[in-house]
């Protein structure tokens, strides 16, 4: 089976119509999660970088749109396209974090509410015992600027896999093919997959479009 569990559209600040995203996935994949950007609990840390202050309004405006009817539209369309046995859809949404790195909460239930948090660790606590995966992605960016911090990794059912590859590039290490192409910076060894493995962590690996 092939799918994409981290796929964006313009419901927040991705590109392309949401229905087009589902239609394209249905033509080629077995399952998908079209994933809104939903929150950034430590966004005020951007104030330490004057050149990045514009980013705050850009993101918070999108989060407001999601909470002013956007999430209900997203949830309804996710249910509409779910066709068990042929094509599965999943509710998922993304939280950014300067400290912890970006994560997606992927829900088994198609009735999942939008759950906020004060930090990624707080998010993980809220989802304990539920059928929710909390997975880090674009892990190779610089720690402190939305790259992953392996000291917060918890091995187990809640985070059975991490995202090694996406349109951002390859997070296997800080060298090698497909460098990071986004304006959030080059790859950083301490956030990479190989670094996590060298710490003795055990996890599965996935790739998504993001």
Could you tell me what each predicted segment is?
Residues 1-209:
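Extended, charged catalytic domains and RNA/DNA-binding interfaces, predominantly
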């Amino acid at each position: 089976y092939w799918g994409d569990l981290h796929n964006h559209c313009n419901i927040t600040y991705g590109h392309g119509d949401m229905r087009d995203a589902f239609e394209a996935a249905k033509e080629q994949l077995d399952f998908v999660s079209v994933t809104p950007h939903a929150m950034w609990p430590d966004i005020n840390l951007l104030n330490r970088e004057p050149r990045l202050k514009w980013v705050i309004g850009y993101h918070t405006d999108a989060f407001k749109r999601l909470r002013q009817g956007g999430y209900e539209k997203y949830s309804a369309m996710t249910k509409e396209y779910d066709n068990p046995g042929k094509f599965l859809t999943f509710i998922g949404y993304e939280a950014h974090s300067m400290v912890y790195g970006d994560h997606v909460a992927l829900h088994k239930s198609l009735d999942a509410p939008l759950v906020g948090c004060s930090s990624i660790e707080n998010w993980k606590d809220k989802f304990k015992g539920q059928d929710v995966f909390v997975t880090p992605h674009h892990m190779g960016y610089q720690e402190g600027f939305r790259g992953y911090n392996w000291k917060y990794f918890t091995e187990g059912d809640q985070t059975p896999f991490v995202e090694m590859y996406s349109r951002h590039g390859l997070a296997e290490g800080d060298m090698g093919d497909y460098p990071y192409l986004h304006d959030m910076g080059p790859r950083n060894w301490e956030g990479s997959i190989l670094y996590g493995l060298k710490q003795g962590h055990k996890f599965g690996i996935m790739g998504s479009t993001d």
